[in-house]
């Protein structure tokens, strides 16, 4: 709100996480949604007041709706057991060898991109992936166009989970060999999104004491990891990524001006906002 009043940006993107974190952790059915909506409303008030004060137009965009899940699916472990993924032992645990692997998966909730080094291996990799419990659909080649992902940055194979499942990134077969960053918030070294980062490891008896001790070590100049994240992906009860059959579960776009066509694809939102920005008189 202060930024809107003092800096008057032409375009400001604001993320309000109130309906994101709890549904990921506990699932929709396990979250207090009325309370979360009230908290979101309270957070919106100063933003809307500031926008009205400076004459800014407001658009509300949601990316996805959450669903309850009960099963993590480990594609990288399946690829490793099939001899397609390689990991090397380092001083701080096993590290995924992306260049030495014939295939590996980058996981994001209920969707995963599987990158295959040799195109001749695609049929074998697709067969391995399709046989994993919890995998709903597998796309390769031109099939990826059916879900809008036939582009140069996509994996050679794209997998979607079943409705009650989601894709977890771990590639190690023994938790004692997990890399040290697995128990930390580290979005760059993990091959995929890790919703376990929303939790504090419930097996740690005194988590606050551990956090304080790590802060002290860091202040003293020691190499320090805030290793408080659990490895148990079964803690995660909510996810997203699949096409929602029920319109009430789909993303929303709220704004002013002429209503756009129904059934927009998500990439249309950019042009709608740019048009509103450039034609605001």
Place the predicted regions along the sequence by residue:
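Short, histidine-centered active-site or binding-site loop motifs used for metal coordination
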Residues: 18-20, 251, 255-259
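Short glycine/proline-rich, acidic loop/turn segments that cap or connect secondary-structure elements
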Residues: 236-253
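A long, amphipathic alpha-helix that forms part
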Residues: 1-60, 266-276
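Extracellular/periplasmic catalytic domains that process cell-envelope and extracellular macromolecules
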Residues: 5-6, 150-153, 246-247
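A short aromatic-rich beta-strand->coil structural motif
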Residues: 114, 159, 253-254, 273
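C-terminal active-site "lid" helix and adjoining low-complexity regulatory extension at the edge
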Residues: 215, 246, 260-262, 268-280
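Short glycine-rich loop/turn motifs
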Residues: 9-13, 111, 249-252
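Secreted, luminal/periplasmic, and some membrane-associated catalytic domains
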Residues: 47-235
């Amino acid at each position: 709100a202060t930024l809107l009043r003092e800096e008057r940006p032409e375009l400001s993107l604001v993320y309000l996480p109130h309906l994101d974190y709890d549904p990921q952790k506990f699932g929709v059915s396990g979250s207090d949604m009325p309370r979360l909506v009230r908290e979101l409303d309270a957070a919106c008030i100063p933003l809307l007041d500031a926008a009205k004060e400076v004459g800014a137009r407001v658009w509300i965009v949601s990316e996805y709706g959450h669903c309850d899940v009960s099963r993590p699916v480990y594609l990288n472990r399946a690829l490793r057991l099939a001899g397609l993924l390689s990991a090397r032992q380092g001083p701080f645990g096993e590290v995924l060898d992306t260049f030495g692997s014939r295939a590996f998966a980058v996981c994001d909730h209920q969707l995963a991109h599987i990158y295959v080094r040799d195109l001749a291996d695609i049929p074998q990799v697709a067969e391995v992936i399709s046989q994993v419990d919890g995998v709903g659909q597998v796309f390769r080649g031109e099939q990826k166009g059916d879900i809008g992902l036939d582009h140069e940055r996509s994996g050679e194979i794209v997998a979607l989970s079943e409705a009650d499942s989601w894709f977890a990134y771990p590639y190690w077969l023994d938790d004692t060999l997990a890399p040290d960053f697995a128990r930390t918030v580290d979005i760059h070294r993990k091959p995929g999104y890790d919703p376990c980062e929303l939790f504090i490891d419930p097996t740690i008896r005194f988590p606050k004491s551990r956090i304080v001790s790590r802060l002290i070590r860091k202040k003293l100049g020691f190499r320090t990891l805030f290793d408080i994240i659990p490895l148990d992906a079964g803690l995660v009860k909510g996810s997203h990524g699949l096409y929602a059959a029920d319109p009430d579960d789909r993303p929303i776009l709220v704004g002013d001006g002429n209503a756009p066509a129904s059934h927009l694809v998500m990439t249309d939102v950019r042009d709608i906002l740019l048009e509103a920005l450039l034609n605001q008189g």
